[in-house]
């Protein structure tokens, strides 16, 4: 299965609680954190929710 590299590029301060929870679910805590996740529909949905705080490769 394909994987996606997700990097946090913006702070979570002042964001909606649901968006903070989504970032936690993705495994991102701090600016500059990078995680590798499987390319599934669930992960794609999470990415769509917080697209403005992350970078995808």
From Swiss-Prot:
The gene is rpmD. NCBIfam families: rpmD_bact. This is Large ribosomal subunit protein uL30. PANTHER family: LARGE RIBOSOMAL SUBUNIT PROTEIN UL30M (PTHR15892:SF2), MITOCHONDRIAL RIBOSOMAL PROTEIN L30 (PTHR15892). GO terms for molecular function: structural constituent of ribosome. Keywords: Ribonucleoprotein, Ribosomal protein. It comes from Buchnera aphidicola subsp. Cinara cedri (strain Cc). Gene3D superfamilies: Ribosomal protein L30, ferredoxin-like fold domain. InterPro entries: Ribo_uL30_ferredoxin-like_sf, Ribosomal_uL30_bac-type, Ribosomal_uL30_ferredoxin-like. One of its GO terms (biological process) is translation.
């Amino acid at each position: 299965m394909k994987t996606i590299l997700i990097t946090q590029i913006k702070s979570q301060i002042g964001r909606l609680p649901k968006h903070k929870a989504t970032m936690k679910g993705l495994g991102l805590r701090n600016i500059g954190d990078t995680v590798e996740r499987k390319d599934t529909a669930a992960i794609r949905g999470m990415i769509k929710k917080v697209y403005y705080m992350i970078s995808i490769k």
